[in-house]
Amino acid sequence: MEERMTEMTRPGPVPDEQSKAYWDSVAAHAMELQRCTRCETFRFYPTAVCPQCFSTGFDWRPVSGRARLYSYSIVHKPVTEAFAEESPYVVALITLAEGPTMMTNLVEVPHEEIAIGMELKVSYRDFDGFTLPVAIRP
């Protein structure tokens, strides 16, 4: 049986009505998150209703980009060929200074230097047709 490898492209975001402003801010390298206009809680991922007070009012606010590493996993075997060149890579949960936790990739940090609680900052990686946030050292 002949095994064929096909070139895969990196999956990108599919913005919807709730997330379009977020993805636009990421593309501009200036991340903004929703903030509830009633309780002033920042939230991620964008939603129509605040998970804290159930208000439907929100605005978009720039975030500092400061974060700390909450958890991580080093992926040695990518699930698709699109990530093969980057393997092993780090999938991280980071807690932003404004409160929300988000999943991203931790880049430019040697694996042996990764530590829970380490200070990070949000940066951006541009791909063909889209931009993703990543975490790096400050």
For the regions a protein language model found, what residue spans apply to each?
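Cys/His-rich microdomains that often coordinate metals
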Residues: R43, T56-G57
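Residue-level recognition of beta-strand microenvironments
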Residues: R66-R68, Y72, V109
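Short, basic/aromatic beta-hairpin or loop at an interaction surface
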Residues: E86-M102
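Short, conserved beta-turn/loop elements at beta-strand boundaries and strand-helix junctions
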Residues: Y72-K77, D126-D128
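Residues immediately within or flanking Cys/His clusters that coordinate Zn2+
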Residues: A30-L33, T47
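Short, cysteine/histidine-rich loop/knuckle motifs that typically chelate Zn2+
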Residues: R35-R38, V49-S55
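Well-ordered alpha/beta subsegment
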Residues: R4, G99, M103-P138
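A broadly conserved sequence feature marking short terminus-proximal activation segments
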Residues: M1-M31, R137-P138
